[in-house]
UniProtKB/Swiss-Prot annotation:
Enzyme Commission number: 2.7.1.30
Pathway(s): Polyol metabolism; glycerol degradation via glycerol kinase pathway; sn-glycerol 3-phosphate from glycerol: step 1/1
Regulation: Activated by phosphorylation and inhibited by fructose 1,6-bisphosphate (FBP).
SUPFAM superfamilies in UniProt: Actin-like ATPase domain (SSF53067)
UniProt record similarity statement: Belongs to the FGGY kinase family.
InterPro entries: ATPase_NBD, Carb_kinase_FGGY, Carb_kinase_FGGY_CS, FGGY_C, FGGY_N, Glycerol_kin
Name by which UniProt lists this protein: Glycerol kinase
Residues that hold glycerol according to the record: 82-83, 134, 244-245
GO (cellular component) term, any one: cytosol
Amino acid sequence: MEKYILSIDQGTTSSRAILFNQKGEIAGVAQREFKQYFPQSGWVEHDANEIWTSVLAVMTEVINENDVRADQIAGIGITNQRETTVVWDKHTGRPIYHAIVWQSRQTQSICSELKQQGYEQTFRDKTGLLLDPYFAGTKVKWILDNVEGAREKAENGDLLFGTIDTWLVWKLSGKAAHITDYSNASRTLMFNIHDLEWDDELLELLTVPKNMLPEVKPSSEIYGKTIDYHFYGQEVPIAGVAGDQQAALFGQACFECGDVKNTYGTGGFMLMNTGDKAVKSESGLLTTIAYGIDGKVNYALEGSIFVSGSAIQWLRDGLRMINSAPQSESYATRVDSTEGVYVVPAFVGLGTPYWDSEARGAIFGLTRGTEKEHFIRATLESLCYQTRDVMEAMSKDSGIDVQSLRVDGGAVKNNFIMQFQADIVNTSVERPEIQETTALGAAFLAGLAVGFWESKDDIAKNWKLEEKFDPKMDEGEREKLYRGWKKAVEATQVFKTE
């Protein structure tokens, strides 16, 4: 009887369940979208119960549609949209407020106040993160401050906090396990990444009671079992958890110090495994935990690009220059260059290494001869320039020259982007056969814990290269193009509307 690992990939717009066999191949996929809530400008929220029902639905569907029995599931791995915050009543199981999503800016005033009080460096030193609404800690404080009676309930021990992984494990285990893993804990602004425990000083600054917080566990461990009524009467081990970007790093088999992966999703996320060393960044990168496994924690440097694949959606839906995302490749390759056009897609500001929230998108170098093809090509190239910005920051901070870049996410199907990426960073770009690396990483973590795979070496054999893109551009051309990009970014930052 063939066994499988069931991976739950709980994302920002949809929940998916993916079955993996022992070769790391996909045996079935189910997906369900759920509603986004925007109660005020800049606020983004989800209904945590709706997320839970979407996860139940895709688990059921992937098993039923692929003629798999529940007793063929060797273990469950969970990967999740990071930072999104749920606070719920531990007796009723009901959330006391919507889940506040990682994108939501509703805690800006809390962050500003803590900065004004001089605590930014304290948070940076202990957590490796910036004091930003992106992370979970200020979201918990906001809920406790703004939901009537919440603070009193929390102090009485009646409320629980969790990121989405914690919420799902608690529900799947029938309220038995209130846990998170090192990678998710490291995104809360409340976890000391050096001492590997919740930090009392930070909790005091955020006024968050410690009794709300989950127990922090390794990323690969049996945390509990599914309660029988949620899983066809079976008690299946819940055995792997990691935040989405860290799961992708693991799914790309980036196990060695200096290994790097880049995800081209709605935004872009680059992570470098820095081994057992938490590298302090001087270049606007985040220091975070990659994963904890076998009693050992691996750290990572992370760079965030706010607009990556969403720039292609903008070409399609906003400007109507293309009918489908793949069409952008054929337009881009009809011309040999952009003829000096640069697109800086700072629609919501600039991420690493600039961290300029006030910058807005700009286009430079237009002439009467500029055509649609040049514009589309310049937009695609912007993904690659931003990636080089992050990679240079990583090399500078870590002292490691990146030897190859493993890639995943929707935009990696675009061969033009992959080749230009290799050219502009002067590094080989490796596209894997299985591009569902986030879900695969969660499956690998769960599989290790239940003995489905024996070791990381065993897993690395399952990583297969689909195509390698080697740099072909000469150095003079590469540096000239990149200098133009840096000038365009500088001009974008100078021009700001009031």
